[in-house]
Amino acid sequence: MSIGSHSFSPGGPNGIIRSQSFAGFSGLQERRSRCNSFIENTSALKKPQAKVKKMHNLGHKNSTTPKEPQPKRVEEVYRALKNGLDEYLEVHQTELDKLTAQLKDMRRNSRLGVLYDLDKQIKAVERYMRRLEFHISKVDELYEAYCIQRRLCDGASKMKQAFAMSPTSKAARESLTEINRSYKEYTENMCTIEAELENLLGEFCIKMKGLAGFARLCPGDQYEIFMRYGRQRWKLKGKIEVNGKQSWDGEEMVFLPLIVGLISIKVTEVKGLATHILVGSVTCETKDLFAARPQVVAVDINDLGTIKLNLEITWYPFDVEDLTPSTGNVSKASALQRRMSMYSQGTPETPTFKDHSFFRWLHPLQDRPRLAILDALQDTFFDKLRRSRSFSDLPSLRLSPKAGLELYSNLPDDVFENGTATTEKRPLSFTFGDLPYEDRVPPANSAEPSSAHVTSSPDIATTATQHRARAQTAAAVTPAEGKACPGVRCEPRGHGDSCQEYPPGFQKPSDTGSDRVFIEANVPVSLLQDTDEGSELKPVELDTYEGNITKQLVKRLTSAEVPGTPERLPCEGSISGESEGYKSYLDGSIEEALQGLLLALEPHKEQYKEFQDLDQEVMHLDDILKCKPAVSRSRSSSLSLTVESALESFDFLNTSDFDDEDGGGEEVCNGGGGADSVFSDTEVEKNSYRTEHPEARGHLQRSLTEDTGVGTSVAGSPLPLTTGSDSLDITIVKHLQYCTQLIQQIVFSRKTPFVTRDLLDKLSRQTLVMENIAEISTENLGSITSLTDAIPEFHKKLSLLAFWMKCTGPSGVYHTSADKMMKQLDINFAATVNEECPGLAETVFRILVSQILDRTEPVLYSTMSSEIITVFQYYNYFASHSVNDLGSYLLQLAKEASVVQMLQSVKDGKLQQNVSKINSNNLPPQQEVLRALALLLNENKNEVSETVASLLTATAENKHFREKALIYYCEALTQPNLQLQKAACLALRYLKATESIKMLVMLCQSDNEEIRKVASETLLSLGEDGRLAYEQLDNSPGNLSELEVAGELNLPQLSRRTCLSVTATEEGWSCH
């Protein structure tokens, strides 16, 4: 092991910081004063790769019982153990959330084998979490019993003292004898419980990392290290090699934790056969070793700290033989992703790990029965269905073991495809009718098995018709009450003929195919009809490309459609092909974005009033989306179970095998309004459905809530949170995610007040946006006829409103893409901008889009199509900059872009020619200018960097410029771009920004040596305050406050520990 290849220091001037918290102690008084505990770092949780070495006499847990109880020590160890177990649980919960989200993202572009592997990981993590929870309950139970015995023992002890001081008598002596017996019993019980608790402490895996010393270790030196922990021993010898490496005869050892006992470490230098020089001996605390993550410690062996022993200690709550699941196993997850492209378009014909089955929808062959899917399911579904007498019995027939409402998953939509490149999908048609409750039998003799297949179910008849080449599915919902009417479809009952009538407006389906399956169910029309105008329902198209038939039926019946009028906003439009990038925001549903925001907000909710205001508005919005008032109530709540059961009876067509019973909160929000293009063929059908049945959503949703107790909640409802408009749903998700990002930045920069204030102002504006969205969601979307109804202030900015309407498309007016806005800006303003500043139009438009999105760096062209801009972002940006005319504002941005261009010319060598044109008076404090200035400071040319440095120093005298620059550069320190971080450090140096000292101190903990060096130099350049901060960092890094930084920031998460170099790189965490 090469000690030189590791850095055990957070970055002091000498490269290694002295350990002050873990010096151990010996018989000397001054060394006792240095006794402290092991410390913890934040390296990634590791999985043991193999069975590690144990002492030969430690094959079993401790069975010896202590002679005397140690209640104070037990309490300390219990607290440490409980914290460690809770931390383990939290780490695994985080990993479970990440894997679940990854599974959901992969469902659309992956195959069955990949999903199966990932789901196995999820199941393993869940099992391990359940085991942890059970382990925690056992520990709590033992400690509770221990506390009871301790109180009894204390009581008996006090009674002993009382009787000892009282006059002696026969009764007193008898009582004292009884008390002594009880006291002994309670003491033995405490000792027994201590032994049992000790068996639940898990294992410490200690890995030898080598010795480190300041010019103390020489090639050829031999050392012997002896560790003693109770009755456990570990002795190993090592030698310092010529190349600086160290060779040791042992690398790792497992110690069983003890309640009473400290680890004693003795290091001796071997000079000869009988010559051993004691280097040092220390005794170390162990209670702080109960942590979920591996900890690297540097132990001061001698008084001066010139010899350090580096160990990596990992605690496992269970035996190492019981290998933990791969939490944080990034390599396996990435391997899964690499394998995604290796799978063909077909899916394996293998059953999954649940009661569901996956079926491969093959292209029909001439000699192949065309109803193979129904034949395969006949034994498991239709046989049971044949014996049922009503739809209320159907929940017991479901293939899924779940009770209650079905949880709809989102597997790839091509799960019914075959392996060929061009596949043809077979349509299914579901027709609901009021059929008499009588047994139906298939024809006695059928010429072709697939021509007619009629089950004997009293409620569902299936008839096969000819194949239709068009890959589309129709579900015709036909109401009838009591007897046959023009909407009834008569199925054959023993004969090959069939009669069929269609009301006006219905399109007769083709009878030339043989691959359509019609399923008829008795569903009373009163559930879907409450007024005279809802007397009939038009055919509703279902698309097999959507993959989930049942979900489409629920979604179609519950979509919040309204009558389509020319003056209405096109906010109910579905996501079309031109806006594929928007789908990711629907995949990341409102529930997920809401959960992410609340998780980020919860620990810090009491710190700022703005956090509390945002929390209140977000919860208000959540309540509105959960409890949106239905248009009208169902006439009979009992009828809702009929529809629910009828839809659940089609679960055999559902492709969701990866849903868990408790996975209801993982719904993907596709938006109720997005049903138009998915289910309807023509605008006539869309408008007729909207006109006649706007209350369908209200009926079904309210009925399900009444009868099942499950409404539109996140966890239990088949209906995901939605406003009824895809566009508004995307807008909500975008702003929830932006609020989460702001909270994370506020938490990171909370020690820099001027940055925090600016971020809190942005968060306050987002709170107002949430309030506005809640008002819009409360109202019926059909009553909003223009954006001025949603944002009344747009009346004062009609030119901006007109441009926004040009940027929006059929997917809705509440959002657009950055790509669309760029194209529209080019159409409307390119000529004007290029006339004023030739060649800068595209640059100016990109700057505008980046600023609307509140990005510190320009938006990449490759991500333009997927970047979402909401109408609230658009309006708030121009309102905050007091812009009424977009054209004039673009010309202003063009002048700023010309300044950036001049700065770039300085980089190209035209220094003397352009530096005179740039001075502190005409230098605008815009982020593009500030970014260009900072990046120029990174130039290797001294002439360029010196010129820019003098320019920044001069502009620092301008109070307005300096304030804007400080805010931008401090926010840049939180970005993952290392070059931008370095440039921001240099810029703060020349601005003499003493306000940024605390953020620079945090950067001094970075693993990147260049960043650490620049941050340290910047600290030292900030006068006395900076020097003192650097010295404090050098001498006592453990005094730094813990940073609570989210993973999106990609910055080191520092903890209040010492003797560590905890760093974050672009690839991930590293710990030394």
From Swiss-Prot:
Span list, region Disordered: 439-465, 683-718
Keywords, in A-Z order: Cell adhesion, Cell membrane, Cell projection, Chemotaxis, Coiled coil, Cytoplasm, Cytoskeleton, Differentiation, Hearing, Membrane, Myogenesis, Signal transduction inhibitor
UniProt GO BP: cell adhesion; cell differentiation; cellular response to chemokine; chemotaxis; muscle organ development; negative regulation of cell adhesion; negative regulation of establishment of T cell polarity; negative regulation of protein localization to cell leading edge
GO molecular function: 14-3-3 protein binding
Stretches of the chain forming a coiled coil according to its record: 83-112
Cellular component annotations (GO), alphabetically ordered: apical plasma membrane; cytoplasm; cytoskeleton; filopodium; stereocilium; stereocilium membrane
Tissue specificity of this protein: Expressed in myoblast and myotubes (at protein level). Expressed in brain, eyes and skeletal muscle.
Ranges of Basic and acidic residues composition bias in the record: 683-698
Start and end residues of each stretch annotated as Necessary for interaction with NCAM and myoblast protrusion formation: 173-470
Biased composition annotated in UniProt, kind: Polar residues: 447-460
Protein task: Acts as an inhibitor of the small GTPase RHOA and plays several roles in the regulation of myoblast and hair cell differentiation, lymphocyte T proliferation and neutrophil polarization. Plays a role in fetal mononuclear myoblast differentiation by promoting filopodia and myotube formation. Maintains naive T lymphocytes in a quiescent state and prevents chemokine-induced T lymphocyte responses, such as cell adhesion, polarization and migration. Involved also in the regulation of neutrophil polarization, chemotaxis and adhesion.
Subunit and interaction comment: Homooligomer; homooligomerization is regulated by RHOC and leads to the formation of concatemers through the association of N- and C-termini. Interacts with NCAM; this interaction is necessary for myoblast protrusion formation.
Family (UniProt): Belongs to the RIPOR family.
Protein name: Rho family-interacting cell polarization regulator 2
Lineage: Eukaryota, Metazoa, Chordata, Craniata, Vertebrata
